[in-house]
A protein has these predicted regions:
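Alpha-amylase-like alpha-glycosidases and glucanotransferases acting on alpha-linked glucans and related
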Residues: 1-86, 111-335, 339-341, 346, ...
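Conserved, well-ordered alpha-helix/loop/beta-strand core segments that scaffold catalytic motifs
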Residues: 78-110
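C-terminal accessory segments of extracellular proteins
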Residues: 372-387
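Short Lys/Arg-rich cationic patches that frequently serve as NLS/NoLS or arginine-rich RNA/DNA-binding motifs
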Residues: 389-397
């Protein structure tokens, strides 16, 4: 379908769309490397660049030049796909913004090994001379995982990144800030320190902790891209060093209510214990169960504490109670999901980390949008003093 659209576009390119396309290509220099990467993947039957012939795998200048000439038309096809996507995306974003809606986007900390970034910027990653990773990312064994988590992503060479004044990360964040109104940085604690596992290990055993770039990186990002518009996903082991980084960066941190219900009442995730307004409270996230699904899987003692704290008698009341305490908290921003508004359980969960097959399949139906839910959320937003000020329209003279 898109090949057909591209063919028609190529034959009839003219007018405003033609100029838009030229501008898009001129303003996005990353397109050349990305489109060549995609064209070469097609030419190699979808194989990872790690399996390409040595001259291309190592980006020999002559081999890359020849490939650009040979696959010029395929490269243009992939440039067209990007052009169409971003053209439509920015129309959608404008429509949302015009209706008072901001979009929060996620930016992962690491890249996939089989990506244009790693192939084209191999010097920025911990790879050997043959472009094979020396170490990969993950998380060590703990009480929740006997073998730890082996993510497998190549790890940045932070010394080289610093030598280049974090050029790659500045570009990445600048682009993300254009795509979204607010950017949530995934695994923020990994910038403080990271766990490096020898490449080839079958589990996360045998890895080592190393210092990350810490505030040095974010100081440059702030200087080059501006201070606002970022949320730090700081879930995990919060050490004094991580707290220091969060304070230096001054990004809002995350408070997930599902982490809050330690029966002692002392959890830092309980709204009464927030020490700063500079945070975002979540009823649940895309990686967690829904509030109702989470509650149904608790032990009896914790269930009783949750009910007492929220003042509810039945499980069905819990999602609304979660939204209520989130909205009435002192956090600068409060987040909930359609699943919570609809009172759905585990059947509506979006993602189970470290699994494949049935994730990211849940969809909101038109019937889920009810006048009752809208009125409830509107009123709660008003009495919680979370309604944005209404912009006064200028009178025509």
């Amino acid at each position: 379908m898109m090949r057909l659209a591209f063919g028609r576009f190529s034959k009839g390119r003219n007018g405003n769309v033609s100029e838009e396309y030229k501008t898009f290509v001129a303003e996005n220099p990353w397109l050349e490397n990305y489109t060549l990467f995609m064209a070469l993947k097609d030419a190699h039957g979808g194989k990872s660049w790690c399996e390409w012939e040595t001259p291309l795998r190592l980006r020999d200048v002559t081999a890359v030049y020849s490939a650009k000439k040979k696959y010029a038309k395929d490269m243009e096809f992939y440039a067209f796909l990007q052009f169409e996507f971003f053209r439509q995306w920015y129309k959608l974003k404008k429509y949302a913004n015009d209706n008072g809606i901001q979009i929060i986007g996620d930016i992962p900390i690491y890249c996939a090994l089989d990506s244009a970034d790693v192939w084209c910027e191999s010097q920025l990653f911990q790879l050997d001379r043959d472009r094979v990773p020396t170490v990969v990312a993950g998380f060590p064994p703990d009480a929740f995982s006997e073998d730890g988590q082996l993510w497998g992503n190549p790890i940045y060479d932070w010394d080289r990144m610093k030598q280049e004044n974090y050029r790659w990360w500045v570009g990445r964040m600048s682009f993300a800030k254009k795509l979204y109104d607010i950017v949530r940085i995934d695994h923020f604690i990994g910038f403080n320190s990271y766990y490096a596992i020898p490449f080839g290990n079958k589990t996360a055993h045998g890895g080592e902790w190393h210092d990350g770039p810490k505030y040095d990186l974010f100081n440059v990002i702030k200087r080059e891209t501006g201070k606002g518009g970022i949320i730090a996903e700081d879930l995990g082991i919060i050490t004094p060093s991580v707290r220091k980084l969060l304070k230096q960066a001054a990004y809002p941190s995350m408070k997930v209510l599902q982490f809050a219900f330690d029966p002692t009442g002392k959890s830092e995730y309980l709204p009464q214990n927030y020490t700063s307004q500079n945070c975002v409270v979540y009823t649940s996230t895309h990686d967690s169960d829904t509030a109702l699904g989470w509650f149904n899987n608790l032990d009896r003692k914790t269930k009783q504490f949750v009910k007492e704290y929220l003042g509810v008698r039945h499980a069905a009341e819990l999602p609304e109670a979660f939204i209520d305490i989130a909205w009435k908290s002192t956090a600068d921003m409060a987040m909930t999901t359609m699943q919570e508004l609809c009172g759905f359980g585990t059947e509506a969960r979006i993602n189970v980390p470290s699994t494949i097959g049935n994730n990211w399949r849940w969809r909101t139906l038109e019937s889920d949008f009810t006048a009752k839910s809208a009125a409830y959320l509107d009123r709660l937003t008003e009495i919680s003093n979370r309604k944005p000020p209404v912009k006064k329209s200028r009178k025509k003279r």
